[in-house]
Regions:
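Short beta-strand-loop/turn "lid" adjacent to the catalytic site in phosphate-handling enzymes
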Residues: 59-62, 81-112, 120-121
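Short coil/turn connectors at secondary-structure junctions
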Residues: 34, 44-46, 87-88, 122-126
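Acidic/polar hotspots within intrinsically disordered regions
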Residues: 5-7
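Short glycine-rich, Thr/Ser-proximal phosphate-binding strand/loop in the N-terminal lobe
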Residues: 36-72
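Alpha-helix C-terminal capping segments
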Residues: 52, 119-123
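Short glycine-aspartate micro-motif
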Residues: 36-40, 90-92, 126-130
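Short, Lys/Arg-enriched N-terminal segments with co-localized hydrophobic residues
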Residues: 11-33
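A short, N-terminal amphipathic alpha-helix
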Residues: 72-83
């Protein structure tokens, strides 16, 4: 499970770094401490990873409603001191219920995340067999 979370962190960092390369550093943006959140809303489980000022991860059952699960994730993050509506937090969502994450800065398909994660882990171009 630890390897899974490491992969999610790599994918999240890679996506955000590419999207904001000219405007932000992954460590700080304009002198602020930043938090980066990767959310994978699957059909049965939702996985969340936080990296930056806070370093956390957790898993919740998705249940019948991805929208309700997103609210639970948002509330749990707030309990941990991570405000997803803050300019100091950037969020990437993927998975079956990714569209329900209305507070995400970026929404990416699972296939794209797998490809970017595989490339990051392999250190360059590679083949992925699913």
């Amino acid at each position: 499970m630890k390897k899974y979370y490491e992969n999610v962190i790599l994918i999240t960092r890679g996506i955000l770094e590419k999207q904001h390369r000219n405007r932000m550093s992954l460590k700080r943006e304009k002198g602020r401490n930043m938090n980066y959140v990767g959310i994978d809303i699957g059909s049965t489980a939702s996985k969340v990873v936080v990296e930056g000022d806070k370093k956390e991860h957790f898993v919740l059952p998705t249940g019948w409603s991805s929208k309700e699960t997103c609210e639970k994730i948002k509330n749990k993050l707030l309990e941990m001191g991570v405000d997803v509506t803050s300019d100091d937090t950037k969020v990437v969502a993927t998975g079956y219920g990714r569209i329900a994450v209305d507070f995400a800065d970026h929404v990416i398909t699972e296939i794209t995340c797998h490809a970017r994660g595989g490339r990051e882990l392999a250190g360059g171009d590679c083949s992925i067999i699913d």
